[in-house]
Amino acid sequence: MENETKQTNTNEQEPDIFAQKLREADSLYAILSGCTKEPYVYCDPETMDDAILLFTDEEGAKAGAQKLAEQQIPVGIAKVDRKSLLLFYTSLYTMGVNAIQVHVGEEQKMIQLTEFVRRKDPEDSKNGKVWVENPELHLTMLYYMQDLRRQPNQEITPELNDLQEEIGAHFTKGRYIVPLPEEGNGIPLVKLKSGDIFQPIFTDVIEFQRFNREKKFRPVVVDAIKLAQVLPEEAKGIVLNPLGVNMPLTVQKVKKQPEAPVQKPVSVEAQIDAAIREVQAEAGRE
């Protein structure tokens, strides 16, 4: 996939120029999906990259959003300030995105995420801490919800069925962050428009941080196979990343086992700080 991208760039200097703009911009503008509240993702038909759209100017972003809207794709734009860029780029890794289509004026280039911002393998840098990420699941959910919510009462197509199967396969292999209150009893619950109650869980620390801005909750890590054991009685299932892709999944409840192992807490701030330090260090070496 990386070789294919390099072949499209006849001038070897160009990717560096575009990557430099990504690093040094005071602000950038991202196209957001109206279906997921996250960056709009698409699969490039030529390179098969899973990419997002970034613009260096607001007018260009508005024009790009208008083109998508004309295709009945609900989108908006979001300004990303310089101080938030590193965390924004780090979040692309957790989303499963591997490339950015960068628009500078009338020019555009597909830039691989690893060409301008790199990080070490979390498995090599967690220092005994529990590191939670589910990029394949997160990406598949984004594609699924972008399509499913595109039109009201849309029928389930064969393509959506395939994505559902992929989501199920990825989900059962993962481990997730479950929020518990710092003080007192009770587990946070989310009430959907249907009136059904779901327990929020998160694919990664960045999604948990969005939910826990007031720091009322502490995170614990639970494997997918054990989620049914910790599901509150009143909850119909779980909802993944409620402030983002917001995907509910019904979970078949099982009798809680008192001998179940204690869930280990994960340090959210430490993991985000570590990810940012690694990104800064790698960018400084280039």
Segments the model singles out, each with a brief description of its role:
Residues 1-286:
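An interfacial alpha-helical scaffold signature
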